[in-house]
Amino acid sequence: MLHAEQLTCIVDDRPLFAALTLSLAAGELLQVAGDNGAGKTSLLRILCGLARPESGVVSWQGQPLAKVRESFHRQLLWLGHKPGVNAALTADENLRFFFPSSRLQQRESALAAVGLAGYEDLPLSQLSAGQQRRVALTRLWLTDAPLWILDEPFTALDATAMETLTRRLEQHARQGGSAILTTHQPLRPLRCPLRTLRLGGDAGGGQ
């Protein structure tokens, strides 16, 4: 599905990781771990095609990303460490922006799944940081993208929301989807394949 070969990333003359190779198959989850500054977000951005590595190649379905970028991005859901929502819009308006062909019932069901039933018409500026994060994560209930790349998706979530997100990740994997995520929180045992890639120490990475 997704493959990265011999990736090297250097930021401000400092190597974050070198000669890093990874593969992600359908139905698999990959947790990227490491201390702050180890290069977790940089790696995710490279895998998304949002940044270039110093060296190395990222491939999607056996083709270099540079050759299939448009097709790849149609099959990718990327959530950065910031919510990426418009605080001036309502929860429903934000979801309509991301999914213009979605139906109101679908959006309401997705918001209910993350514990935000009845919040459809509230401006996000009136919601807490955790609630805004949940609005952003609602996209996981509306997308049909097979590949999710998520940077710190558990940030600002309470225990109930964390459990809801964990169950959604398991469901996605059971349906043949894949996900790469970073998180500072230890994941509870999952009912799907989970591997860990740790960055740091020797500026490299290992699985």
PLM region spans:
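Conserved ABC ATPase signature
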Residues: 123-128
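Helix-to-loop junction immediately C-terminal to a conserved catalytic motif
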Residues: 48
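Conserved ABC ATPase "signature" region
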Residues: 105-119
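Q-loop/switch helix immediately C-terminal to the Walker
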Residues: 82, 87-103
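Conserved ABC transporter NBD signature motif
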Residues: 53-72
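Hydrophobic anchor residue at the start of the ABC signature
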Residues: 137, 176
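Catalytic Walker B motif of ABC-type/P-loop ATPase nucleotide-binding domains
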Residues: 148-152
